[in-house]
Amino acid sequence: MIVALQMCSGLYADANIEQLNLQLQQLPATRPLLVCLPESFLVFSKSGQQTLAIAKQSDVYIQQLSDLCRQYDIWLAAGTVPIATAHDKYFAASLLVNNQGDVVAQYNKMHLFDVDVADGTGAYRESNFTQAGNDIVVVDSPFGKIGLTVCYDLRFSGLFSALQRAGAEIILVPSAFTTVTGAAHWQPLLTARAIETQSYVIAAAQVGQHENGRATYGHSIIISPWGDVLSELANGIGFIGCQPDLNRLHAIRRDMPVQSHQRFREHLL
């Protein structure tokens, strides 16, 4: 089973870990269980400097996440954890941790949110403190082959196509969409990516008014390879879940083999 937690993370990592612990106590007893967390679940700061300070001690928090995985016998897709680089910046790293507490995959967010939005924040400049990643990540798991993305990556269909070609059956999209962009684009983009890649899309989201002054859209959602909404949580803290049917996924890919029909390649331009 896979579940997506919807969270309203705050300024302080310790408090956010405690919120996570409380939410984990409410989850079903089904095992194996993959728990997907939203972007910035560990710290949703007012400044890149505050996040950078957390990034420089990320090992401490990753150890706490590993301990939770062992305690609850779960796999954890840790939305984003800031991990310091050598350039006084940090990666927005999506980590996959198994039920033994081992980090089995790390994806560093590739596309950074340098955008102007008509909301209370106005200007977002993620690249001021975040270093972009370069590599796609697909990893085997008891739940299927998992492809990792983060939030703004959702707008770049080529990344999702690359994940599908690399074998992804389930694509995770931990996010902290603004209320403005979320209302306009969130579900249409997620549905399109699920249909295009014929994959399950699991999108755990931040929700509500945060201590840093930001407001996020929520609407955590799970979408099937056919584009059906399997579960959604519009507002509030909580969780949604599904049991992916990989036989159904492969039947869809067999009956409509769009990848084998694909003739367009960017390198031909």
Please place each PLM-identified region on the residue numbering:
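Cys-nucleophile CN-hydrolase/nitrilase-fold catalytic domain and related Cys-dependent amidase chemistry
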Residues: 21-100, 106, 115, 177-193, ...
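CN hydrolase (nitrilase-like) catalytic-core segments centered on the catalytic cysteine
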Residues: 57-77, 145, 154-240
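Active-site catalytic loop in hydrolytic enzyme cores
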Residues: 86-166, 179-181, 188, 254-258
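Short beta-strand scaffold segments in enzyme catalytic cores
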Residues: 78, 93-96, 137-139, 220-222, ...
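Short polar catalytic/cofactor-binding loops
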Residues: 6-13
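Extreme N-terminal starter segment of soluble prokaryotic enzymes
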Residues: 1-4
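A conserved C-terminal secondary-structure "cap"
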Residues: 249-269
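Short, acidic/polar
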Residues: 15-25, 155-161
